[in-house]
Amino acid sequence: MTLINALKNNLSHSNVPFNHWIINNPLSEKAIDEIYSINFPEGKVIFDGTRAGDKTGDNLLSKLRIFIDKDNAEEYSELFGLVKEMQSKECTDFISNLINRDLKNSYVRLEVIADRDGFWLEPHCDIKEKLMSSILFVNRYGENENLGTDFYTPDLEVAKTLPYKNNTGYIFTSEENSWHGLEKKKIKKERRCLQLNYVTFETEWPVD
């Protein structure tokens, strides 16, 4: 129950520039091993400021994102364990109270991300279907800590950059001005992350 333990014991709050929570040590070392065990393909991709690389409709970055589903849950058992933690009533009750959102009848979505040099993410607010957004950073490659997510003011000025430190991350719920993204920065090898969401649309993982 690494995630739940971190939520209860290693969480801090900030409201600059919008409400969010910093979480420390949410992942076991075995889970981090699994995140790094995933082999993403090499090759040229086009970065367009979106997570999916889909401004042209081509979904250019789909191969650099792996969703944990029933087809790979056995292979990635530690990450599947994290899905089950998120499905549990203990976890949903805690996060629901934290972000003041009703997570009943929601679904868990979990994906491993491998951002390569050239990737950037334009400032945006998440879609309303994302009830909770969280990125957990894993940084075993010694990447610069400035590769964490950028949070913006309503005028789209960078207000703060969350440090890209291994086994740390953040949680927030979409608000009117919860602008976030990633400025264009140098990635030496790879910016690998784990994205956690509670969503209203159906996935294979309904909450308990």
What is the predicted role of each segment?
Residues 3-98:
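Non-heme Fe(II)/2-oxoglutarate
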Residues 75-87, 91-208:
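Catalytic core of non-heme Fe(II) oxygenases with the double-stranded beta-helix
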